[in-house]
């Protein structure tokens, strides 16, 4: 089936995917985490198509379907190597959009970034 959504990505072993996917029984909203410890579906629920949003606040990631919080990852350390000793090549994560499959339309619209000053810089 089809899939479309948002991903927080560090590498092929460290990412989260929040999206909608078509199944034989309808549409599901789903948050999946892949970390060095393995792959986990954090939450999966029937949903109508809607607007997806991911907010990042330090290590916390919040995921919204329309204006309702779908799930929260309070400590998403798997998206960075700081303090983990993972021997990765750089520190930093990316955010991306994905759409795969047929017979659907994915519209990617707004990216909003606000000024952020980490606590250590104050």
Task: Give the positions of each predicted feature.
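Extracellular glycan-recognition regions
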Residues: 1-122
């Amino acid at each position: 089936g089809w899939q479309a959504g948002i991903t927080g990505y560090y590498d092929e072993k460290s990412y989260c995917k929040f999206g909608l996917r078509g199944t034989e029984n309808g549409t599901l909203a789903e948050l999946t985490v892949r970390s060095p410890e393995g792959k986990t579906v954090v939450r999966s629920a029937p949903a109508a198509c809607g607007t997806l949003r991911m907010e990042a606040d330090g290590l916390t990631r919040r995921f919204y379907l329309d204006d309702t919080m779908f799930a929260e990852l309070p400590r998403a350390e798997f998206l960075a190597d700081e303090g983990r000793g993972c021997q990765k090549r750089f520190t930093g994560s990316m955010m991306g959009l994905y759409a795969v499959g047929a017979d659907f339309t994915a519209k990617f619209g707004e990216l909003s970034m606000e000024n952020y000053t980490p606590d250590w810089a104050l």
